[in-house]
Amino acid sequence: METPIKGRFTKTQLMNIHRFLFEDIYPFAGLIRREQISKGDTMFYPPHLIGQELDKVFAKLHTERMLHETDRKRQIEHLSYIMSELNIIHPFREGNGRSIRELIRCMAIHYGFTLDWSRVDRDTMLNAAVRSVVDDRAFCDVIMACIVEGQRCTEISLNKK
């Protein structure tokens, strides 16, 4: 078991997760991208806006007290919102999906439940990612499908695969 990436759900924590996951693969691990990128018809945020947009997303997470939510349905909606926003920002050149999923998994643990992303297939995840550009609740069904019922997690661990 690796040492967990601790944080308060901030841009820095997301960058640290990315660095941890990809430091042995990419020289740009943990660094915000400086290139304009797209996938298919989806154009992600331009590099000069990434930092401020990430700050806005994480500020909203904290100012609206999303981390204090106790209603499971609202928790899932918050997770979907954060996941959708981070997806369209796409802060890294590569590895956005894995880094974002790990941050969302950590947030779920904060809420008191566990997510197992292997419960949904790649196509389901990609379809939700495409829809999330126009619907910040696009990941709700994916997150629901990934909840491990009856397992309450109190420790965050991050293992490289």
Describe every region a protein language model picked out.
Residues 1-161:
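FIC/Doc superfamily catalytic core
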